[in-house]
Design a protein with these regions (language model features):
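Mid-domain Rossmann-like dinucleotide-binding core that forms the NAD(H)/NADP(H) cofactor-binding site
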Residues: 133-215
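NAD(P)H dinucleotide-binding glycine-rich loop of Rossmann-like/cofactor-binding domains
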Residues: 90-170
């Protein structure tokens, strides 16, 4: 038997018990989970800001780490006993989509190709990746979403960063913190836009220039070479274009609520300003997990330089609330 967090409706999470299926689908991998992370996507679902949810009630979550417990008959990527990272980012392997499973009360519950907030996860083969041997389990869970998205932007989309490059980073949540640590290793000129008091206290250790209000932002109009936007605010994505100079670039990995749109001054684009979205930091995790780990000198960098807090599964609503308040960069469910 295993337990999973089930989103019943907006702002209502329940913990359900499930019996293991008698047989896995041919593309599926069963993983006993050590840690699972809560990121902005789950919080958006919880708050009902992704629009109408057609799959309620459903398990959710999309980054985790654990050990392979069983595999479907056509799975070749991993074997029983392998230590693996789970991610929403698709890699090599089979993927025949989501499925339903009855809980112990005989109610049908929806599961996706990966639904990670569960003591045991049944995932499609293409969402499962081998964990590097030297990588700590707690570090590894962040490689399911936060690290490839944040650090991936820096390594895959901003390859020309130099020491004299002026970079503005907006928002220091899980993805923003990963981008920050990658930028610090690039030794460029970093400015942070943040006004959450918990996060400002955390940022003191890095001794960076902080832009806290609109006055300071206006002073830096047309100033930056690059702006990385991770706050999830449509208004801040718009503001990013004001901050870069005419040949500058904005990359945003944030996901504003459904119905929030950005308005762009056409003259910004005529000037030569560029704006790009980022899908998982343009990462291919079958190779980029190792690539990013190597970039950080095979060290467990993120658990040493992030505000991470562990919670039990039955404290998941508290974990979400503390992320929303900015008390932690990443909330981790420990199983």
């Amino acid at each position: 038997m295993f337990q999973a967090a089930i989103l019943r409706k907006k702002k209502k999470i329940e913990i359900h018990n499930f019996n293991f299926p008698q047989k896995l689908r041919c593309d599926q991998v069963l993983i006993k989970i050590k840690y699972a992370g809560i990121c902005g996507s789950q919080i958006m679902e919880y708050l009902g800001k992704r629009g109408k949810d057609f799959y309620l009630p459903h398990c959710f979550g999309h980054e985790a780490v654990g050990k392979v417990f069983a595999i479907g008959k056509r799975v070749t990527k991993v074997k029983i006993g392998d230590k693996v990272i789970l991610s929403w980012i698709k890699g090599k392997g089979l993927d025949f989509g989501g499925f339903t499973l009855k809980n112990t009360k005989k109610e049908k519950i929806n599961f996706g190709p990966i639904s990670a907030l569960s003591s045991h996860v049944i995932a499609c083969e293409n969402r499962v990746f081998l964990k590097p041997d030297k990588m700590n389990y707690l570090e590894a869970v962040l490689y399911g979403c936060a690290v490839p998205t944040g650090a991936g932007i820096v390594l895959n989309q901003l390859k020309k960063i130099r020491e004299n490059t002026k970079v503005c980073l907006i928002g220091v949540g899980g993805v923003g913190n990963a981008a920050l640590l990658a930028l610090l290793k690039k030794k460029c000129q970093i400015y942070i836009v943040e006004n959450n008091n918990y996060k400002l206290k955390f940022l003191k250790k890095f001794n960076l220039k902080i832009l806290k209000n609109n006055f300071e932002l206006r002073k830096h109009s047309n100033f930056f070479d690059i702006c990385v936007e991770t706050s999830g605010s449509a208004k801040m994505i718009e503001k990013s274009l004001d901050l870069i100079h005419p040949s500058g670039m904005v990359v945003f990995a944030s996901h504003p609520p459904k119905g929030d749109y950005i308005k762009i001054n056409p003259h910004h684009l005529i000037q030569g300003k560029k704006i790009f979205g980022s899908w998982g930091g343009c990462c291919h995790l079958d190779k980029d997990i190792q690539k990013i780990f190597k970039f950080f000198d095979y060290k467990n960098t993120f658990i040493k330089n992030s505000k991470i807090k562990k919670y039990s599964l039955n404290k998941i609503s508290l974990a979400i609330e503390e992320v929303l308040k900015g008390k932690v960069n990443r909330a981790i469910i420990k199983f």
